[in-house]
């Protein structure tokens, strides 16, 4: 039969590339699970009353090349002006060796958060390097492995200051008047829910204020002034006030470390170390504190430990501080951070080293001196005598200056009274400075950059002597040996090779949705039209961004069944926080601010109670019944008991137990009956898209994990995006922004992120995914994700009981394998199975969440039947190994499971085990073998002997 032209065009080609099992494989799998078709399977699993009649209309599928061309045209609407706006964002030069071998490399960007350290040693080492950079530049004792952005880090600094303060009755937080406005915005948002009073005043007035527990200063003020705060910090410390200092990585290369001046906490953005502005993100924040406060630090901390063989190995340290363990008592609700961006900054420091960084920082400062000297010679006045890279220039004809700047396609900072701000950066050239002279002085100024350079080269007084760094930085060998491109390329490859990412095997982590991050989706993020825009540039320069964001928002509104969408939150946890704030402010608008009880099922993600606590709510836990579903009797009783204090419920759907609860609409009705709102956690949205939606179910607000459902890669622990969808009545209460008016948003609320659209530069990934899949493709992706999970559950249920199922014994898009009976019977634990899977070439499923002693498996739609079968066969082989332990063939103390994983070093060493080398390292044959570089980590040793900076190079050899 002759094919039609439409068939030959094959506009749905990407659907077949994204979805792993082909049509024939799907039929084989459907036969295994006992269903006639995908639609029949979904009909058996998803409650009929919440099934959509047709998928939301987000357009038809298109090819990768057509989608790229369409998005390229949209990107072309952006105007690439030269931006000197500053305010925490500057143009950068990302070394091509890092761009090509790391940012564009799926071995780096498709990895997961390093909960399994044995398969994560490469990026853990890069993160440890990031911590070392932070320690050297800040002069403090302990650093985290990144936070979401500088403004969020400021809010975390305030919260930490209160936690560690000895002034327990003090309730005021002082912010110096010259911090970045977006930082103040986010601090105020956080302070409101914590009940803190924020005082904003000139730094020299801080001692005039009483009942202050913490102070936030900015070393280089938002308009450029370099401050020597050493005397003030000393006085504040004498009064037991916790001092936080916002700093700039590049400035710190030349300036005195705030820790050396007595600061307790130092934070800032690492964006200047090679990360493009990207219209606001993603960027990693750095955060450091004194050793005495280490247990109160927010965010992930990488520590040095030992493995089972006594060799040095890295791991995430002190995890008992974090939300996945401490829940509402956690230091922070942070889950996703900015690992990929922290590692770019880390590798930027490795590549340039201390000498290269000093050269870059000195060049930036030299250009600032040249510009300042020329302007002063022509009679213009600088507002600050001491500066690093930013000049605040007083101008009489401000409108004329800005008009000349626009004509020259130059952005200056324009929001300063009677002045303009100019922030120089590593991309600044002599020609750029000449153009700035033309803009500020007109063409007839007669200034010459080379002549001015000779004047300032030997007599720069623009940084006070007391603020010049006098200690060495980055003396560790890792920062001093990889400066040729060959060495740098090989170093990055050596790190990548230690890790297990999606480019080698499936990552079956439950509740994480480790699906394909297609190459076509990733290509646009490095286009200069998207990567080079400043987040505070004039709106008419970002028309392409706004069109792309508006289209994506419209699609997501349709897919979620909501009325509006806020794109600001740049992680799922931050989306939760923003959604809960919307609920809080909605109640307050109705004079019901007393509603502060948040009901949370016992199975919930750890971020849920942590976010509720951060939003100023009291957490009340709702029980689950024996089938893992929300206990409606307990829910009704607790909702009724809360009465007029009920604010909301946070519920995940399908449930965290991997089941579509039949009573989800009744759950919503009960909460609404008592005046509460329904927050539906979007973590499991991959089992809803095209089949049902939160709005259709009856929820009021949800966040979406674009880094799960909509293909933004996990990056080894970030970036992410957590936009929130809301019903119309909550739309006025989503986050706003003090610097940029967000188009179409009538909100007057404060910001939760530094940038108005969060991590805007990764949104093209989700745009591309939806555009290429179309409505039917998105629905099919959800259906196949459910099929894959049921295929695994069906094939493994006789070997490992599936803990929770819905009607007809089905699961949703993930399943929980109960290891507890096996452990009771044989002594082999879920940890042993997880580590043994490494020998078989797999990342472990999620361990002991949401139920201790279990493994939660989520295969996603992207894994082929071949890969699913490989995983199933590995699990069945491990089950047989457990039988051999039970039967006494191997002892409980010496068998391939308790000794897993096995390394190459072990293979060539003297062998004393009661099983063969082949059983140890080649249990699934030799094809595509993954070799872990360390044995099982000793977590207890790591926390008892906390060490969170770079170790001698000999330890890695």
Curated annotation (Swiss-Prot):
Catalytic activity: N(6)-[(R)-lipoyl]-L-lysyl-[glycine-cleavage complex H protein] + glycine + H(+) = N(6)-[(R)-S(8)-aminomethyldihydrolipoyl]-L-lysyl-[glycine-cleavage complex H protein] + CO2
GO terms under biological process: glycine decarboxylation via glycine cleavage system
Positions where N6-(pyridoxal phosphate)lysine occurs in the chain: 708
Pfam families reported in the protein's UniProt record: GcvP2_C, GDC-P
Taxonomic superkingdom: Bacteria
A GO term, aspect molecular function: glycine binding
Keywords: Oxidoreductase, Pyridoxal phosphate
Its EC number(s): 1.4.4.2
Top EC class for this record: oxidoreductase
Cofactor(s) required, per the database record: pyridoxal 5'-phosphate
Database matches in InterPro entries: GcvP (IPR003437), GDC-P_C (IPR049316), GDC-P_N (IPR049315), GDC_P (IPR020581), PyrdxlP-dep_Trfase (IPR015424), PyrdxlP-dep_Trfase_major (IPR015421), PyrdxlP-dep_Trfase_small (IPR015422)
SUPFAM superfamilies per UniProt: PLP-dependent transferases
Function field: The glycine cleavage system catalyzes the degradation of glycine. The P protein binds the alpha-amino group of glycine through its pyridoxal phosphate cofactor; CO(2) is released and the remaining methylamine moiety is then transferred to the lipoamide cofactor of the H protein.
Oligomer status and interactors: The glycine cleavage system is composed of four proteins: P, T, L and H.
Entry similarity comment: Belongs to the GcvP family.
Protein name: Glycine dehydrogenase (decarboxylating)
The species this protein was found in: Enterobacter sp. (strain 638)
């Amino acid at each position: 039969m002759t094919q039609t032209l439409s068939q030959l065009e094959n506009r749905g080609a990407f659907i077949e590339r994204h979805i792993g099992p082909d049509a024939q494989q799907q039929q084989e799998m459907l036969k295994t699970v006992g269903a006639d078709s995908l639609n029949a399977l979904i009909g058996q699993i998803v409650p009929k009353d919440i099934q959509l009649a047709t998928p939301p209309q987000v357009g038809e599928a298109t090819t990768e090349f057509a989608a790229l061309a369409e998005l390229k045209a949209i990107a072309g609407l952006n105007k690439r002006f030269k931006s000197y706006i500053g305010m925490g964002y500057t143009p950068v030069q990302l070394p091509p060796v890092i761009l090509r071998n790391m940012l564009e490399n799926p071995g780096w960007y498709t990895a997961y958060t390093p909960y399994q350290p044995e398969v994560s040693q490469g990026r853990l080492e890069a993160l440890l390097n990031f911590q070392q950079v932070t320690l050297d530049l800040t002069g403090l004792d302990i650093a985290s492995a990144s936070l979401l952005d500088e403004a969020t880090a400021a809010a975390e600094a305030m919260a930490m200051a209160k936690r560690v303060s000895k002034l327990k009755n003090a309730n005021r937080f002082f912010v110096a008047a010259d911090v970045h406005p977006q930082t103040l915005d986010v601090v105020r948002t956080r302070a409101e829910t914590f009940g803190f009073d924020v005082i904003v005043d000139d730094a020299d007035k801080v001692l005039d204020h009483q009942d202050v527990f913490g102070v936030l200063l900015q070393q280089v003020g938002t308009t450029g002034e370099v401050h020597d705060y050493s005397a003030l910090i000393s006085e504040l410390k004498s009064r037991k006030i916790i001092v936080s200092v916002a700093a700039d990585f590049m400035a710190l290369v030349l300036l005195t470390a705030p820790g050396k001046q007595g600061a307790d906490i130092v934070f800032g953005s690492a964006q200047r170390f090679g990360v493009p502005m990207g219209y606001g993100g993603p960027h990693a924040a750095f955060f450091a504190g004194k050793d005495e406060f280490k247990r109160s630090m927010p965010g992930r901390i990488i520590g040095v430990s030992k493995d089972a063989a006594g060799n040095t190995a890295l791991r995430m340290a002190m995890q008992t501080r974090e939300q996945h363990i401490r829940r509402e008592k956690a230091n922070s609700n942070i889950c996703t951070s900015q690992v990929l961006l922290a590692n770019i900054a880390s590798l930027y420091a490795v590549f340039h080293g201390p000498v290269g960084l000093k050269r870059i920082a000195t060049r930036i400062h030299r250009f600032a001196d040249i510009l300042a000297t020329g302007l002063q010679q022509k009679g213009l006045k600088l507002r600050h005598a001491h500066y690093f890279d930013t000049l605040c220039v007083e101008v009489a004809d401000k409108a004329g200056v800005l008009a000349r700047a626009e004509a020259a396609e130059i952005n200056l900072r324009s929001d300063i009274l009677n002045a303009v701000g100019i922030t120089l950066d590593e991309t600044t050239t002599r020609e750029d400075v000449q153009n700035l002279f033309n803009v500020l002085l007109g063409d007839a100024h007669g200034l010459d950059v080379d002549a001015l350079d000779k004047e300032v080269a030997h007599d720069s007084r623009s940084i006070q002597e007391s603020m010049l760094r006098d200690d060495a930085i980055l003396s560790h060998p890792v920062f001093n040996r990889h400066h040729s491109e060959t060495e740098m390329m090989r170093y990055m490859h050596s790190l990548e090779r230690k890790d297990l990412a999606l480019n080698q095997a499936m990552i079956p982590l439950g509740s994480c949705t480790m699906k394909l991050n297609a190459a076509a989706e990733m290509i646009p993020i490095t286009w200069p039209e998207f990567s080079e825009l400043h987040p505070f540039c004039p709106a008419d320069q970002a028309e392409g961004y706004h069109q792309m964001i508006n289209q994506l928002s419209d699609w997501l509104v349709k897919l979620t069944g909501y009325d509006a969408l806020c794109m600001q939150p740049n992680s799922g946890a931050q989306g939760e926080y923003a959604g809960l704030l919307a609920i809080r402010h909605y109640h307050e608008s109705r004079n019901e601010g007393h509603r502060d009880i948040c009901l949370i099922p016992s199975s919930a993600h750890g971020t849920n109670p942590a976010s509720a606590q951060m939003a100023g709510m009291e957490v009340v836990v709702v029980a689950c019944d024996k089938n893992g579903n929300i206990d409606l009797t307990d829910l009704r009783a607790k909702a009724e008991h809360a009465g007029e204090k009920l604010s909301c419920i946070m519920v995940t759907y399908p449930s965290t137990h991997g089941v579509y609860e039949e009573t989800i609409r009744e759950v919503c009705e009960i909460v609404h009956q008592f005046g509460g709102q329904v927050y539906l956690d979007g973590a499991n949205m991959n089992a809803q898209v095209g089949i049902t939606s939160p709005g259709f179910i009856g929820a009021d607000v949800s966040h979406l994990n674009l880094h799960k459902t909509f293909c933004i890669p996990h990056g080894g622990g970030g970036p992410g995006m957590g936009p929130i969808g809301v019903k119309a009545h909550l739309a006025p209460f989503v986050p706003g922004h003090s610097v940029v008016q967000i188009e179409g948003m009538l909100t007057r609320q404060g910001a939760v992120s530094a940038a108005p659209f969060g991590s805007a530069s990764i949104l093209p990934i989700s745009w591309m995914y939806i555009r290429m899949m179309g409505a039917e493709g998105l629905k099919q992706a959800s259906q196949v994700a459910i099929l894959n999970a049921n295929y695994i559950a069906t094939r493994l249920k006789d070997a490992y009981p599936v803990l929770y199922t819905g009607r007809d014994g089905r699961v949703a898009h993930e399943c929980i394998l109960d290891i507890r009976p096996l452990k009771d019977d044989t002594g082999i634990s879920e940890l042993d199975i997880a580590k043994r899977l490494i020998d078989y070439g797999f990342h472990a499923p999620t361990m002991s969440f949401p139920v201790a002693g279990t493994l939660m498996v989520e295969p996603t739609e992207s894994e082929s039947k071949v890969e699913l079968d490989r995983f199933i066969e590995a699990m069945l082989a491990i089950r047989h190994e457990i039988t051999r332990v039970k039967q006494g063939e191997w002892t409980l103390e010496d068998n391939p499971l308790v000794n897993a994983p096995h390394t190459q070093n072990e293979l060539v060493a003297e062998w004393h085990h009661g099983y063969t080398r082949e059983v140890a390292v080649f249990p699934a044959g030799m094809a595509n073998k993954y070799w872990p570089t360390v044995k099982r980590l000793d977590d207890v040793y790591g926390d008892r002997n906390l060490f969170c900076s770079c170790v001698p190079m000999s330890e890695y050899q």
